[in-house]
Amino acid sequence: MSFTIAIIGRPNVGKSTLFNRLVGQKLALVDDLPGVTRDRREGEARLGDLEFTIIDTAGLDEGAKGSLTARMQEQTEAAIAQADALFFVVDARIGLTPTDRAFADFARRANKPVLLVANKSEGKHGDAGAMEAFALGLGDPIQISAEHGEGMGELYDALAKLMPEPVEEDEDEDDAPLSEEEAATRPIRVAIVGRPNAGKSTLINHLLGEERLLTSPEAGTTRDSIAVEINWKGREFRVFDTAGLRRRSRIEEKLEKLSVADALRAVRFAEVVVLMMDTQNRFEEQDLRIADLVEREGRALVLAANKWDLMETKGGGAISGLRRDADHWLPQVKGVPIVAVSGLMGEGIDRLMQAIQDAYAVWNRRVSTSALNRWFEQAVQANPPPAVSGRRLKLNYITQTKARPPSFVLFCSRADAVPQSYLRYLTNSMREAFDLPGTPVRITLREKANPFAHKRKRPS
């Protein structure tokens, strides 16, 4: 069982900076504005030879009952209940505030080991605030600078006394080549994206069976890409809920820009992307832009038509209408899976999870060279390539170079002369022949070398 630590404290004391330092990459948004982190988020952390799970939380703050701030506090309380130990973080430059003192009592009542961390201790101004932290009665403050990496040795010494002896384990490298068996058992990385307030967090909360992610009628409740583990019928999924992707003209605040960048990183890290659309306002310009981004990044795509419970007309006719719209507006991912869901009511969840698993299998698919070239001969015979500048194009053969997504190289006589329309014909024909709906298909043109090009001409 992994040792788990929750980082707690009032807003803007540097909790997310410490989280990023321990995880080793920027998984949490960091800014000078209070309350940047809204949900609790987890990561696998390392400090020297110590390995543990770390939870970053929203800043402890007092808010009206039922307000978003109050629910942020509930998320923090849930993280404390899950943790084996706590990092209570204070700002050494500012010193103690009444909020620090109030929530120090809160931390003591948790009955968990607490390490008092005086962050932002670099320079002369940090010493006074760190000394002031003694008054909290949580032991000696550990002076660090999460931003600059100072004091990590002292934090290591204190944490090592709390943790059990580490157990040696073999670790799979995340980017190591996978066998078919490994690909079938490894957690599928899924990013759930969409416009703000499309219902992304509500859907994940229903999958988890708990309010792990904050939800609100206010657009933009989620700010970070939040990763959660889900087991569905014995299959593991790592699901990223993301900040809503808005039109660029509406991204005004600095924090909003950080959130969108975080969502884009989640798309690039994912293997399957679920684009959630409001059923009553589907295929708006921003939906199409997001789908195009997913295709360009080479990720498998699944469309989730959310709020299906609000539709007046349901059934096969409504789904067929969705399919026609999708094929019209998204020809680059023709046949993309579409699932009608209600994140609030829990309708369509099983179908969505199966669609994700199917899309992942298609994204990983390899086609044998013999089957590929049998199809290729038939496709070219049925619709030969056009003549360009009075010369017939010669298409030689095709081979698959990789999966994830399926990528192919087509050898031909003049690569720059093959029309894009003919390339689209081959792509759509291949999708139909090998059942590759919705996943990006890459066909790269390459000229076949002329074996006689470099031979000397015989003397006459």
Swiss-Prot record:
The keyword Glycosyltransferase does not apply. Keywords: GTP-binding, Nucleotide-binding, Repeat, Ribosome biogenesis. Gene3D superfamilies: 3.30.300.20, P-loop containing nucleotide triphosphate hydrolases. Disulfide bonds: none annotated. The gene is der. One of its GO terms (biological process) is ribosome biogenesis. Residues 3-167, 188-364 form the EngA-type G domain. SUPFAM superfamilies: P-loop containing nucleoside triphosphate hydrolases. HAMAP family: GTPase_Der (MF_00195). GO terms for molecular function: GTP binding. Pfam families: KH_dom-like (PF14714), MMR_HSR1 (PF01926). Residues 365-449 form the KH-like domain. It comes from Bradyrhizobium diazoefficiens (strain JCM 10833 / BCRC 13528 / IAM 13628 / NBRC 14792 / USDA 110). Associates with the 50S ribosomal subunit. The keyword GTP-binding applies. InterPro entries: G_ENGA, GTP-bd, GTPase_Der, KH_dom-like, KH_dom-like_a/b, P-loop_NTPase, Small_GTP-bd. This is GTPase Der. It comes from the Bacteria. GTPase that plays an essential role in the late steps of ribosome biogenesis. CDD domains: EngA1 (cd01894), EngA2 (cd01895). GTP 2 binds at residues 194-201, 241-245, 306-309. GTP 1 binds at residues 9-16, 56-60, 119-122. The lineage of its organism: Bacteria, Pseudomonadati, Pseudomonadota, Alphaproteobacteria, Hyphomicrobiales. PANTHER family: GTPASE DER.
